[in-house]
Structures are given as structure tokens and as C-alpha cells.
Amino acid sequence: MAVNAKNWQELKKPNGLEKKSGGDGKRKATFVAEPLERGFGLTLGNSLRRVLLSSLQGAAVTSIKIENVLHEFSSLAGVREDVTDIVLNVKQIALKMQGDGPRRLQLSATGPAEVTAGMIAASGDIEVMNTDLVICHLDDGATLNMELTADVGKGYVTAAANRPVDAPIGLIPVDALYSPVRQVAYKVENTRVGQELDYDKLTLTIETDGTVTPEDALAYSARILQDQLQLFVHFDDGMAISAPAAGAGAAGGAAGEPEGDANQLNRYLLKKVDELELSVRSANCLKNDNIIYIGDLVQKTEAEMLRTPNFGRKSLNEIKEVLASMGLRLGMEIPGWPPENIEEMAKKLEQEF
């Protein structure tokens, strides 16, 4: 099957992702991507927003059990709020949980006191992010003993769905909002490329509950879309990028064949990573890992690169951006690489230029 790589390689791609933090950068940030082909701002913005709000994993309280309370329409002596108000406040607790649930949490307080989320006795793998959230107020001599059940999930789950079949008397299920993303807004504007104004500028504002940073939330949503869309790609990159065969010309094709898109990409594979104009740190890491040609580099996965000593996320993003400008990426499979006469082929290619 012949694959025309121009379908995706010749589309205009953003130069980079600009981040603008607003106030608390761990909770709210704005991202700008430009230039995009006309229509891609709306396509990407709407898709990312829907995934951000619906599909990210998080933790939430699913039920509570209060001592001496049989149902949510009860009231407690010495507690200013009724149980319904307490449930509404508990729903706003932001939890960061490592591992799977469900987990049990305890909250005990004696009045007079303002009971906050920070008073919850959490284990080492559970962290309450909004510790100043007020749950209720206790008068002098009043006591509150509450057991909370927390679990992990995605999206929004109603209290009815959180009620176990064998729920004991006094167990009050709670609506669970698992999504760590609280608000997402996007805006699409015109932007200039040279003298042309027919391109999109996507501005995406993300606000989270603090359990995940806006930058990570955006990365997770993009990865979800990437994983879902992979089903629709019925060819692999090897069909578009043919590895240079032994004895082939510098372009990697047979003698007399016209140079197509695959041949142009083969030229990139034969270039040395020294020609990528990377930062000194990134270049040294590649050199220490014995990565000489771009063909060697693109076969490495992100995980393999991050295991390289002194190689961090900043260097990884730099390399991914450079490869993307050539229509390449990490984690590619190139059958027959490296060719036996790679040095001769690379030298011949260098002489041509």
C-alpha cells in the first residue's frame, strides 16, 4: 500500500505551546497554540474541552456515615448545619489518591469548632487539597464522628449509583465528581503566517481542583484522543517511511526511481543528530547514548529517552518538536535499520547538499 505522507506532513503545525499561568499556576493556566490550519482551532479546542471535562481520572467521596444519623434528612444536636448541608459540603472535598479505592477516612471533632476538610485523618497515600473547606460548625459540647468512603473514577456518578446493594442503615451516598478539571474555556482567533491571515490561533484556559496541574490535565486529554484515534489509522509509519536498503542510493530508493515523499523522509533518517541544532545538554545526552543518526533516534520511545542519564522532560520536548517539524516522531518502527553501508550512504547524501 502506497501512503501519501503529504496528507499530514504539509499541514501547518503550531510552533510550540505557550503557557500563561494565572494566579495559582497549579490550578489555573492558559495555553496558546498557533498557527493551526483553518478549522483546526475549533476541532482541537472542542475535542480537548470535552475530554478534559469528562474523561480524566480523579478521586472523590462516594458516601458518608455519621454517628447517630440514620438518613440525610436528620439533624444533629449542637451542629448548626443539617445533614443535607453537610453532604453538600463534603461533595466539594478535593482528594488526591495514589492507587485504587475504595478507602475509608475518619473525621472526629468536638465543639466549639469550625470543622474543616483539613481535620480529616487521611492515610499517606491520600491527600486533601482544599484543607480550608468548611464542612460544618459545632457548638460547645457537640461532637461529630464521621466515616467517609473515597474512591477513584472518572466523570460524574450520582448518589443513587454510589449506593451499594447491601448498604447498611445510616450510610448516606454522595454524588461523586471525579473529574479534577473544574472549568475549561477555549477561544479561536485569526493569526498571521507571513502575509497570510487564514490560520487559527487556539487559546485554551483550564482550571483544576489542584489534584492535577492544568499542564498535566491537557497532556492527559491529548493522550486520550491520540489513543482513541489510533484505531482509525490502518497503516503504520513504516509504510510511509521506507528504511534505506543496502546498496540503495542516498535517497533510499532504487536507481532510476523518482524521489517521492518516502525518499525525502529517508534523507532525514540518514542525517546525523549533530545537525539538529539541539541544546548542548540534549546533544550530549544523545551522544552518550550512542545515538548518531536521526534513524537511530526516532526508534527510541519516550520512556527509553527519559531513562537516559541527565535527560529530562525539557530535552524530550525539544527533540519531539524538532522531529515533528520533519514529519517524524519518537517510537517509530523502521524495518531494516540500520543499513549495512549507512556511513557511505550518509556521506553521499552530505555531498549532494
From Swiss-Prot:
Give me the stretches of Basic and acidic residues compositional bias.
9-26
* GO function terms (MF aspect): DNA binding; DNA-directed RNA polymerase activity; protein dimerization activity
Any GO BP? DNA-templated transcription
Q: Which reaction does it catalyse?
A: RNA(n) + a ribonucleoside 5'-triphosphate = RNA(n+1) + diphosphate
Where do the segments described as Alpha C-terminal domain (alpha-CTD) lie?
265-353
Please name the Pfam families in this protein's record.
RNA_pol_A_bac, RNA_pol_A_CTD, RNA_pol_L
Superkingdom of this entry's organism? Answer: Bacteria
Record's InterPro entries?
Answer: DNA-dir_RNA_pol_insert, DNA-dir_RNA_pol_RpoA/D/Rpb3, DNA-dir_RpoA, RBP11-like, RNAP_asu_C, RNApol_insert_sf
The residue range of the signal peptide is none
Q: Where is this region: Disordered?
A: 1-26
Task: Identify the stretch(es) annotated as Alpha N-terminal domain (alpha-NTD).
Answer: 1-236
Alphabetical keyword list: DNA-directed RNA polymerase, Nucleotidyltransferase, Transcription, Transferase
Cellular component terms, GO, for this chain's entry?
A: cytoplasm; DNA-directed RNA polymerase complex
Which CDD domains does this UniProt record tie to the protein? RNAP_alpha_NTD
Q: Establish whether keyword Transferase is in the entry.
A: yes
Q: What is its EC number?
A: 2.7.7.6
Described by its record, this protein's role is as follows: DNA-dependent RNA polymerase catalyzes the transcription of DNA into RNA using the four ribonucleoside triphosphates as substrates.
Q: Give the multimer and partner information.
A: Homodimer. The RNAP catalytic core consists of 2 alpha, 1 beta, 1 beta' and 1 omega subunit. When a sigma factor is associated with the core the holoenzyme is formed, which can initiate transcription.
Q: What is known of its domains?
A: The N-terminal domain is essential for RNAP assembly and basal transcription, whereas the C-terminal domain is involved in interaction with transcriptional regulators and with upstream promoter elements.
UniProt record similarity statement: Belongs to the RNA polymerase alpha chain family.
Kindly provide the name given to this protein in its UniProt entry. DNA-directed RNA polymerase subunit alpha
Q: Which organism is it from?
A: Rhizorhabdus wittichii (strain DSM 6014 / CCUG 31198 / JCM 15750 / NBRC 105917 / EY 4224 / RW1) (Sphingomonas wittichii)
Gene responsible for this protein:
rpoA
